[in-house]
């Protein structure tokens, strides 16, 4: 089967890995790839793209070039560097899995780390618990400040506080929960 090993985080610059088990037009079944988008989860996306490329008859060099030139869409894992700040914009149609993946990416960043999170919508009847679980997950990360805005996002703040209160080795994230959103904008603006 197709698998990856030698997975190395390049921080906010992406991830490199070796892919095995696909047959390219130049007869390579093992080669190195670098995904220029951060997050371990992006390895799976790159592997799927490489597999599709091999089925379409691409060479390992063409697959490598395609993966290396990956561009994200607005609101999906965009890294914005401006005025000495680095922003990870992953707000489009957020869900618990994507939010946790973004927190993993933020956890790898160097310097002071601030997560600004809003409510996730269309999650169904367990939406409050899902937000709370994201907060508990955030509590396991090396994140300095959490700022939330929105009714459901308050559950993220509650989950983070609960994790910190019950785990003596928790990082100690500073938690701020705002409602309405305008109060938050005044705080960070």
Regions found by a protein language model. Give the residues of each.
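Extended acidic/charged loop-beta regions that coordinate divalent cations
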Residues: 1-30, 73-74
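ATP-dependent carboxylate-amine ligase
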Residues: 23-28, 38-41, 47-189
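Beta-strand/loop nucleic-acid-binding surfaces
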Residues: 33-36
């Amino acid at each position: 089967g197709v698998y990856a090993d030698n997975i190395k985080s390049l921080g906010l610059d992406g991830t490199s890995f070796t892919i095995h088990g696909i047959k390219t037009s130049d007869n390579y079944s093992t080669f190195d790839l670098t995904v220029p988008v951060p997050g371990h989860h992006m390895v799976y996306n790159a592997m799927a793209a490489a597999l599709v490329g091999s089925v379409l008859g691409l060479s390992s060099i063409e697959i490598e070039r395609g993966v290396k030139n990956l561009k994200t869409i607005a609101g999906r894992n965009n890294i914005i560097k401006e005025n000495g700040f680095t922003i990870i914009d992953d707000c489009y149609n957020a869900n618990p899995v994507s939010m946790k993946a973004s927190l993993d990416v933020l956890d790898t960043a160097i310097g002071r780390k601030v997560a600004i999170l809003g409510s996730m919508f269309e999650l169904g009847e367990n939406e409050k618990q899902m937000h709370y679980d994201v907060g508990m997950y955030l509590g396991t990360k090396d994140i300095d400040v959490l700022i939330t805005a929105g009714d459901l996002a308050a559950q993220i703040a509650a989950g983070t506080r609960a994790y910190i209160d019950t785990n003596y080795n928790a990082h100690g994230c500073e938690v701020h929960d705002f409602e309405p959103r305008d109060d938050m904008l005044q705080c960070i603006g």
